[in-house]
Amino acid sequence: MLAKRIIPCLDVRDGRVVKGINFEGLRDAGSILEQARFYNNEMADELVFLDISASIESRRTTLEEVLKVSGEVFIPLTVGGGISSVERARDAFLHGADKVSVNTAAVNDPVLISRIAERFGSQAVVVAIDVKKVNGEYIVHTHSGKTPTQYEALEWAHRVQELGAGEILLTSMDRDGTQEGYDNEILKRISTSVHIPVIASGGAGNLEHLYEGFTKGHADAALAASIFHFRTYSIREAKEYLRDKGIAVRL
């Protein structure tokens, strides 16, 4: 059985780590470098760096910060926010990213997924899908959750897989920052219908939520921010809890 991954996420804005609720009401969550070092030493399996205002402001990811983080961590680093072209993906890789995460740009130009995958390999392409329930349907949103699209979540997940995505980062906007648990309904629906790994995101508030993301949502990895940034739990605590409940993790 493949080990399940625990992935902390650094949502970055104006040079600081931030965290909000339902993609709004951001509060400061510390220094980028301090958090990155902490997670590297804490046995995180990977680290995600998301410049959350890059797509809204139509600019590239803050590559200087990416370079600093990549010099401090020795775990796979995924970089997202403002990755709107093959050239910007290349720049992220040159600054130390192991994977890039595309979201808004992929919806606007789906072939971008294929172009990045052909150049750098599918394993380096994560497609972030932000979903919100609208009239009973899970609708994909872009621009940090501000813009609804015409895509239903499952339909888009299948499309990005066909285009060459190596992984899906699925975030429930309704659950984001609420600490009420992942939306395991849509998580299971997508995880069981695609053959690429799916990362659960949005809503982890305790260790049981991580467990449920794996058992009820069938996720391959669990991403969390609040519970780790504010030291409610450590990565080691999370992994030991999961191991004791029969989930394969790296310790």
UniProtKB/Swiss-Prot annotation:
Pfam families: His_biosynth. Keywords: Amino-acid biosynthesis, Cytoplasm, Histidine biosynthesis, Lyase. Its main location: cytoplasm. It is found in: Cytoplasm. Disulfide bonds: none annotated. IGPS catalyzes the conversion of PRFAR and glutamine to IGP, AICAR and glutamate. The HisF subunit catalyzes the cyclization activity that produces IGP and AICAR from PRFAR using the ammonia provided by the HisH subunit. This is Imidazole glycerol phosphate synthase subunit HisF. It comes from Chlorobaculum parvum (strain DSM 263 / NCIMB 8327) (Chlorobium vibrioforme subsp. thiosulfatophilum).
